[in-house]
């Protein structure tokens, strides 16, 4: 048997055996092997196709030959494909002889294809001869793809035409496909040209954050190459982009990746400097193939780069450059780094304006100038974990897609008319024969509605047709403008003038006429993308309210203090200051570099500090659960502080991130409540300094978390003793007591922490008069819970006064009142409900009054 064959030949023989077993054939024969070899993704299939063989007919003949092979009646699989047929043995022997004659070290699929021609009567050979194929053509083809080199590798078939298999010709793609217009970045392109023109170290690597336009710079450079807008030494050069996925695909055995990569690099070397390789995400190839006892791609590249055999352009991010390339000093020296910075807002606007026609043509919409400005400014402000211009383009794409979807849907008026028609038809069917007048009126009304609906549908369809025609003309206009620009670049002035003065002008006139016809008719479809559409996308992606204040929200903001007072009693100053911060934020005049508001609530326990934060979350977000709450008593130890931003690398929980940073990252627009802040370890305050001042915090993974759209509320019991004493003595918080509380605060917290807080609010201790309001708030919650069980609870005013008096405790605020209500109200009601389970389906009315200084319950 053959000493050594390629992995593809071995695998093909194994697969052919499985095919023979599946067909219950006694012997493994040539048709089984050829059925495997000519699968569409196999080397032989591509080999035959390149020789213009009709592969479909070839596969049909192979399948017919398999059907002719005798089938065993035995059901024992061990009896199938036990032997090689004589003609398959002869084929392998002839292939081995071809290998020897060609001075190859391994038997390849090519040897099998050659050996098949020694069996002139084989139907497969007969067909190939009829197609004009012979050994001479096969030898010529082998010499071309091997470039005169012998077969020495066990993965020989995978390294032929490596450049075409594992890389993409960017020059050809730029000529064949329409490419996006590249706006700006001329400095970076000139840097690439300068580096490629050097004698030594003529390899460039673009380093920048994801989304800043590294790949776009290469596309722009390729466009300049294709148009010969480069120095003479670079004219005629071809850029190939490495397809890392194709290079790694199917590399099951050690060394396969290296052989493919070396073959690709050899093709580049053979081009004598005409080919430049572009490696996107170059960090992924540097360590590719790295296993124990083998070399990686960097080890293959370094000698070639050092000798100047190849030229490479790479792109990567700052972090990956540091980890993969900068880490390997020898590799780093071979590259010249080009830093690609994030564009500023003005530069981003230039890019967006340049790409505007592309998005308009694709989606069939119109992009307003304010929409572009909103995409740049809002993405910069509210999407902090990505970079311009990519994030701005994403907003535009998303808004255009949403507008396009809405423009193809039936208008709301038509939906309303359809629903109205159904309602009227139901009414008509329910009328009796005696309701003659009503039937007559309804039938007339139905006819009117049907006519309105038909007219609306016709108008909508006509407008839709006009919009489709406008979009076709716009696409045609873009193509004409590209032709005109190309003519101007090629100095074809006559063609340029003809296109500009005739075809482009006619196209503009047709578009203007169609737009006028649409505007003159009843305009139903909206295809204009404005600032509001972009803001809606930002709000949907981040949860941050950036749209203009709507009418219902305006009412809520104007009455925010009243809404908060519904649940918060006796804390006018605190409610006022928090409300003002929210209104400043929604009006858009607060400092955009700081949180919406940062507050330190001081006061005795049970006076409403935490309750105000909960109520604020309920009013703004619809639920008090929509709040990030951290109990700072859990952060008393020094080692617990790291849980806020996440443990450092190597520690348990590193992948989960920090409790504060992760919560805010998922809810960018939220209320952050740090309860009982004085109990936290002093190092916590160092962490919070950056949040209070700059509105950001870096977690353990190096990600910057944006706190600019949060309301930070910290509560503390510091000074509560002085406040209670003041109330007992004078009934209010005096200026002397306020001074004492602030003095105690200064002793507890550092000045740099206190100076960064927007407002320090002293909560009043609740008086007996305030307690009546607290009782009403708590009872209203109880009434809402009972109403779910069809129980209506009513209390007389004297009950509220009695409960307030019995539950009042100046030292502990409203918390004792919860126990009083539980004992005086909830317990008797619970007992009644248990005793009357049978009447649960009936509505129950409960009235509570006072008799002899005790509560009296009346059930009905």
Curated annotation (Swiss-Prot):
Residues 5-69 are annotated as: Repeat 1. PROSITE patterns: CLP_R (PS51903), CLPAB_1 (PS00870), CLPAB_2 (PS00871). InterPro entries: AAA+_ATPase, ATPase_AAA_core, Clp_ATPase_C, Clp_N_dom_sf, Clp_R_dom, ClpA/B, ClpA/B_CS1, ClpA/B_CS2. Residues 2-148 form the Clp R domain. It is found in: Cytoplasm. Residues 343-543 are annotated as: Linker. Residues 393-522 form a coiled coil. One of its GO terms (biological process) is cellular response to heat. GO terms for cellular component: cytoplasm. Residues 84-148 are annotated as: Repeat 2. Residues 766-860 are annotated as: C-terminal. ATP 2 binds at residues 603-610. Pfam families: AAA, AAA_2, AAA_lid_9, Clp_N, ClpB_D2-small. Its main location: cytoplasm. GO terms for molecular function: ATP binding; ATP hydrolysis activity. Keywords: ATP-binding, Chaperone, Coiled coil, Cytoplasm, Nucleotide-binding, Repeat, Stress response. ATP 1 binds at residues 208-215. Residues 161-342 are annotated as: NBD1. Residues 553-765 are annotated as: NBD2. PANTHER family: ATP-DEPENDENT CLP PROTEASE, HEAT SHOCK PROTEIN 104. Part of a stress-induced multi-chaperone system, it is involved in the recovery of the cell from heat-induced damage, in cooperation with DnaK, DnaJ and GrpE. Acts before DnaK, in the processing of protein aggregates. Protein binding stimulates the ATPase activity; ATP hydrolysis unfolds the denatured protein aggregates, which probably helps expose new hydrophobic binding sites on the surface of ClpB-bound aggregates, contributing to the solubilization and refolding of denatured protein aggregates by DnaK. Homohexamer. The oligomerization is ATP-dependent. The Clp repeat (R) domain probably functions as a substrate-discriminating domain, recruiting aggregated proteins to the ClpB hexamer and/or stabilizing bound proteins. The NBD2 domain is responsible for oligomerization, whereas the NBD1 domain stabilizes the hexamer probably in an ATP-dependent manner. The movement of the coiled-coil domain is essential for ClpB ability to rescue proteins from an aggregated state, probably by pulling apart large aggregated proteins, which are bound between the coiled-coils motifs of adjacent ClpB subunits in the functional hexamer. Belongs to the ClpA/ClpB family. This is Chaperone protein ClpB. The gene is clpB.
């Amino acid at each position: 048997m053959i000493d050594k064959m390629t992995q593809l030949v071995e695998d093909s023989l194994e697969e052919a055996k499985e095919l023979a077993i599946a067909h219950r054939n006694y012997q493994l024969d040539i048709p089984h092997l050829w059925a495997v070899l000519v699968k569409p993704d196999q080397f032989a299939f591509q080999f035959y196709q390149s020789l213009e063989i009709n592969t479909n007919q070839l596969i049909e003949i192979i399948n017919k030959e398999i059907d002719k092979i005798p089938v065993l009646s035995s059901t024992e699989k061990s009896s199938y494909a036990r032997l090689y047929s004589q003609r398959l043995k002869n084929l392998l022997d002839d292939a081995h002889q071809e290998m020897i004659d060609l001075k190859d070290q391994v038997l390849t699929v090519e040897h099998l294809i050659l050996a098949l021609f020694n069996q002139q009567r084989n139907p497969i050979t007969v067909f190939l001869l009829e197609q004009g194929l012979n050994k001479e053509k096969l030898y010529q083809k082998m010499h071309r793809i091997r470039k005169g080199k012998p077969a020495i590798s066990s993965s020989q078939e995978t390294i032929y035409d490596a450049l075409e298999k594992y890389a993409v010709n960017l020059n050809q793609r730029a000529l064949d496909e329409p490419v996006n217009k590249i706006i700006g970045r001329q400095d970076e392109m000139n840097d690439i040209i300068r580096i490629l023109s050097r004698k030594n170290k003529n390899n460039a690597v673009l380093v920048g954050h994801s989304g800043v336009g590294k790949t776009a710079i290469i596309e722009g450079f390729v466009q300049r190459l294709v148009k010969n807008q480069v120095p003479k030494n670079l004219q005629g050069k071809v850029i190939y982009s490495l397809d890392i996925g194709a290079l790694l695909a199917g590399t099951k055995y050690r060394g396969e990746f290296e052989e493919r990569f070396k073959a690709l690099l050899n093709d580049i070397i053979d081009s004598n400097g005409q080919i430049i390789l572009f490696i996107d995400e170059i960090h992924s190839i540097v360590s590719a193939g790295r296993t124990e006892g083998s070399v990686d791609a960097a080890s293959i590249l370094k000698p070639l780069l050092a000798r100047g055999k190849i030229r490479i352009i790479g792109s990567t991010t700052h972090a990956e450059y540091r980890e993969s390339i900068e880490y390997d000093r020898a590799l780093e020296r071979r590259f010249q780094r080009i830093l690609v910075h994030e564009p500023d807002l003005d530069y981003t606007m230039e890019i967006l304006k340049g790409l505007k026609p592309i998005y308009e043509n694709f989606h069939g919409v119109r992009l307003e100038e304010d929409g572009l400005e909103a995409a740049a400014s809002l993405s910069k402000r509210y999407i902090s974990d990505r970079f311009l211009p990519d994030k701005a383009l994403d907003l535009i794409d998303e808004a255009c897609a949403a507008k396009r979807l809405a423009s193809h849907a039936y208008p709301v008026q038509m939906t309303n008319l359809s629903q109205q028609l159904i309602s009227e038809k139901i009414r008509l069917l329910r009328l009796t024969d005696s309701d003659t007048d009503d039937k007559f009126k309804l039938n007339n009304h139905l006819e009117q509605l049907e006519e309105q609906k038909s007219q609306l549908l016709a108008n909508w369809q006509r407008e839709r047709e006009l919009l489709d025609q406008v979009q076709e003309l716009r696409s045609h206009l873009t193509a004409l403008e590209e032709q005109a620009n190309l003519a101007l670049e090629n100095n074809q002035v006559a063609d340029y003038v003809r296109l500009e003065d005739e075809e482009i002008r006619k196209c503009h006139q047709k578009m203007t006429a169609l737009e006028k016809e649409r505007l003159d008719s009843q305009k139903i479809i909206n295809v204009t993308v404005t600032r509001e559409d972009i803001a809606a996308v930002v709000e949907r992606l981040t949860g941050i309210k950036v749209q203009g204040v709507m009418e219902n929200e305006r009412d809520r903001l104007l009455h925010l203090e009243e809404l908060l007072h519904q649940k918060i009693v006796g804390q006018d100053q605190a409610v006022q200051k928090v409300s003002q911060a929210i209104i400043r934020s929604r009006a858009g005049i607060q400092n955009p570099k700081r949180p919406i508001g940062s507050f330190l609530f001081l006061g005795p326990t049970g006076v409403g500090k935490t309750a105000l934060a909960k109520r604020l979350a309920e009013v703004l977000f619809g639920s008090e659960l929509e709040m990030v709450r951290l109990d700072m008593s859990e952060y008393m130890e020094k080692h617990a502080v790291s849980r806020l931003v996440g443990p450092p690398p190597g520690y348990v929980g590193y992948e989960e991130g920090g409790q504060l940073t992760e919560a805010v990252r998922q809810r960018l627009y939220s209320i952050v409540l740090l309860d009982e802040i004085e109990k936290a370890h002093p190092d916590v305050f160092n962490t919070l300094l950056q949040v209070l001042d700059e509105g950001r915090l870096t977690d353990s993974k190096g990600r910057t978390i944006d706190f600019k759209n949060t309301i930070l509320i910290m509560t503390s019991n510091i000074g509560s003793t002085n406040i209670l004493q003041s109330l007992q003595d004078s009934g209010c918080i005096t200026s002397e007591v306020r001074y004492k509380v602030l003095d105690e605060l200064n002793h507890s917290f550092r000045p740099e922490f206190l100076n960064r807080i927007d407002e320090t609010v002293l909560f009043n201790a609740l008086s007996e008069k305030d307690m009546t309001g607290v009782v009403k708030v708590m009872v209203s919650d109880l009434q809402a819970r009972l109403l779910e069980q069809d129980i209506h609870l009513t209390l007389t005013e004297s009950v509220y006064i009695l409960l307030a008096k019995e539950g009042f405790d100046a030292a502990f605020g409203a918390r004792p009142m919860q126990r009083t209500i539980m004992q005086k109200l909830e317990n008797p009601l619970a007992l009644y409900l248990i005793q009357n389970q049978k009447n649960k389906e009936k509505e129950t009315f409960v009235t509570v009054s006072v008799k002899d200084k005790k509560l009296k319950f009346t059930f009905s």
